[in-house]
Amino acid sequence: MSNIPTELKYASSHEWIRREEDGSYTVGISEHAQELLGDMVFVELPEVGDSVSAGDDCAVAESVKAASDIYAPVSGEVVAVNEALEDSPELVNSDAYGDGWFFRIMPSDLSELDNLLDAEGYQAVIDEE
């Protein structure tokens, strides 16, 4: 059973999002997603300054099993990327909700957060797979 922190919001495509003190939002993939993908070998991140729309593929997680697109849960501007993943993609496996984050986004439309799932809703998505 995967760990699904209740303080996060989730996309049905297995990304999580967390509000930071400066108003930006950190994005990563869920523990469930990294378990399905297996050991990460490479992560392709967006560029700081990129504008993304909700649902856009903007990063790639490559594992020993597959390459998977990572989608922006909300629209906005990429304000930071986790450069540690370039040398240590395995952080996604060891700490999916912490050091394994992918990028931070400054949202342009906060109402898009209402389209995301809470932990219970995300668990229901996993259960249907």
Swiss-Prot record:
What detail does the entry give on cofactor binding? Binds 1 lipoyl cofactor covalently.
Q: Does the keyword rRNA-binding apply?
A: no
Q: Where is the Lipoyl-binding domain?
A: 24-106
**Which CDD domains does UniProt cross-reference here?**
GCS_H
Gene Ontology cellular-component terms for this entry are:
cytosol; glycine cleavage complex
**Family to which this protein belongs:** Belongs to the GcvH family.
What HAMAP family would the database entry show? GcvH
Q: How does it assemble?
A: The glycine cleavage system is composed of four proteins: P, T, L and H.
Q: What is the designated name of this protein?
A: Glycine cleavage system H protein
Query: Which organism encodes this protein?
Result: Shewanella loihica (strain ATCC BAA-1088 / PV-4)
Source lineage: Bacteria, Pseudomonadati, Pseudomonadota, Gammaproteobacteria, Alteromonadales
This protein's encoding gene: gcvH
